[in-house]
Amino acid sequence: MAVISLVNLHYQIEGQVILRNINLEFSKGETFVIMGPSGCGKSTLLRLIMGLIQPTAGWIEIDGTNTNLLSNKDWQLLRRKMGMVFQSAALFDSMNVYDNIAFGLRRGKMAESLIEKRVYEVLSIVGLEPSVAQKMPADLSGGMKKRTAIARAIAFEPPILLYDEPTTGLDPIIADTINDLICELQKRLNITSIVVTHDIISALKVADRIGLLYEANLVEVKERADLKNAEHPLMKAFLKNFELVV
């Protein structure tokens, strides 16, 4: 059974179609990259999966549950299965790194002694020193902010991670280390990762499969090893200047 299924998923706002009849399944332990030009609906798709907005038509199944049928309380429980890493990192500026990571754990009523253990555990997992816990977001580099956001997202040990443009705004060297971290987490935790990006370099680094969104439609899905057989002109354009080892 797929971990997440999108069934005839359609979303529009004020008459403008953002996503049109998307059918797609995500498997346990895979990293699926969603690519496409700006405004094609990539980030909207993540917001739909998280339940932050509701589909106009169609539905999403998570672990076999039709999310259209969930109450607000049930949605809150389901979201604990998903960690979200936003493009901006979305850290609380008034909290230090420790409290940013601990925030969700405290809302989940975890004992403070266990919270402390978990905070330092996830800091280690994402490659941050324990001393970073006392730093404020304003004192962090872009890469450190992103690692903190990832640490917060995995603190609850969710089986699903959603990344919205995780390397945007980072220099190429730092971006590459974040891509390495995404790969490491997928292997270490056997999680299902969905990564939205417009960067073909990042996509090729982390993806098991790549889906291309264009003008509200899912126009192509390819295994990483089968990209040499891409058919859609836009996918070919993304790949044109890269030598693929497949």
Give the role of each language-model region.
Residues 157:
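Conserved catalytic motifs of ABC-family nucleotide-binding domains
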Residues 153-154:
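ABC ATPase C-loop
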Residues 136-140, 144:
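Conserved ABC ATPase signature
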Residues 66, 113-131:
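Conserved ABC ATPase "signature" region
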Residues 50:
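Helix-to-loop junction immediately C-terminal to a conserved catalytic motif
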